[in-house]
């Protein structure tokens, strides 16, 4: 998941 815009909530997993 590089794009947090396409990811739901668990987008913080990229950081």
From Swiss-Prot:
Keywords: Cell wall, Secreted. The keyword Secreted applies. One of its GO terms (cellular component) is extracellular region. It comes from the Eukaryota. It is found in: Secreted, Cell wall. This is 24 kDa cell wall protein.
């Amino acid at each position: 998941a590089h794009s947090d815009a396409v990811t739901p909530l668990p987008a913080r997993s990229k950081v």
